[in-house]
């Protein structure tokens, strides 16, 4: 019998896909990848999969790995897709594929199935990651298969299939949008959010924090310490990557930090609207930036900043396991070596303001930077500097005089 691993959530879609795969003659191994998504009873989901005919089911907790090995390297790049999206969903997908393929190798499965649609980005991220890790894996994306779409044109048919197969599904009140959550962020899209005249921030019931208007009237300070670009301490206490993100989610969330509403360019060609909240990661991006301002060489920082949009694109599109990304990650690891220090931020009604920053590797020299008289900067040196810098402009001006 053919064997398949299924990225399984226990929801309606993957419950139906589990049954459908068995109808197609597959032995199915269900994998629930714990990224920090909300779930009432993970044990019940695993039992449900086995009850519904799965050969095996397992939960794999990768929350720490997601923060440490995926989100934090992207943070070091200050990578934001189209300038504002912190890639909370995008960066989780290659990890899901990695976990599912590890299980496939263990159980001898030759196929990998997921429930992503044929119109979104996730299908790209799942498949590009999986085929990079195992070029021989058979990808099964039911929503890209016409016979599956014909059988299940809507939610009603999905529920009817579950009734016939005696697959237990919990009835839920349909919200006017869909959401996807992990420890890094929550994304909201589709439904009423596809109407651009709808105020997304007012429509969405945010799950990670309060609105800026409802945040406390007094600023809250938070101090974050970095070692070579990696967040290590929070308010003076050493924490692991997961603890850092979870605790900052609470702190930043209660101060209304980290909400965005954007229209983005999907990899598959269309524009789509997304509303996102990433309170903890938003604070980390700003905190790291302030330590970098002290410690990174100017030209190195500017080079990183020019390359960061390309890194964001690669993550967003799904090109995580590539030689190019490997090289880029080696670069950023070297670039971040001096980025050690501590920064104190004030969080106030959605805003992030720096209070202080310090670093043993600081390149800031008050004696050089002072605008007062004296200091160690000799202003006479600027004369020769500007004569050399201005030479091309003077020559060009003689050859092609500008009208003014």
Swiss-Prot record:
Q: Which UniProt keywords apply?
A: Amino-acid biosynthesis, Arginine biosynthesis, ATP-binding, Cytoplasm, Ligase, Nucleotide-binding
Q: In which pathway does it act?
A: Amino-acid biosynthesis; L-arginine biosynthesis; L-arginine from L-ornithine and carbamoyl phosphate: step 2/3
Name of the protein in question: Argininosuccinate synthase
Q: Which reaction does it catalyse?
A: L-citrulline + L-aspartate + ATP = 2-(N(omega)-L-arginino)succinate + AMP + diphosphate + H(+)
Can you state the subunit structure given in the record? Homotetramer.
Question: Which CDD domains would you find in this protein's record?
Answer: ASS
Q: Where in the cell is it found?
A: Cytoplasm
Q: Which InterPro entries match?
A: Arginosuc_syn_C, Arginosuc_syn_N, Arginosuc_synth, Arginosuc_synth_CS, Arginosuc_synth_type_1_subfam, AS_cat/multimer_dom_body, Rossmann-like_a/b/a_fold
Enumerate the residues binding ATP.
7-15, 115
Q: Which PANTHER family match?
A: ARGININOSUCCINATE SYNTHASE
